[in-house]
Amino acid sequence: MHLAIFVHRVEDVPPGLYLLLRDPDALDRLRAACRPDFLWEAADDALPLWRLAPVDVRSLSARLSCDQNIAADGFFSLGMLADFDASLQTFGPSFYRHLFWETGMVGQVLYLEAEAAGVRGTGIGCFYDDPVHDALGLHAHAFQSLYHFTVGRPVDDARLTTEPGYPWERTER
């Protein structure tokens, strides 16, 4: 699962579109599948992080996430890209669910790391698959966007409450 990262407000990282490559063997295939105008500049010496486009991606990020501002208002948002065709060809169609399990595990790590850093993360369940693929230049099914996530400062919503689950747990206030 590779991460297409839309960086908005990260200290020492210029805004833009990045790709965190989780499998170095996929680099050539991803480069060939993505837009030819991407830079593919190494963005970090310690991570397989590639700067694709040094541009303001806030409005694009929100648009791709069903026009949800949460994708643009945080530090960054990301789309998880599965090595789709190769996985299904190697392991069969039933492997599809394993790809989603992997996105869930990556999401859980992001939740935990965000909390440990004193910020918040949340999954973004609504995103437009085809426009995400178009933004990256992906036109075949080799790589597919399966899940999105964002990290930023928490926004408390007074409409959300926590109530006891059982009547005997309720106390008079």
Predicted segments with their positions:
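Acidic, surface-exposed loops and disordered segments
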Residues: M1-R173
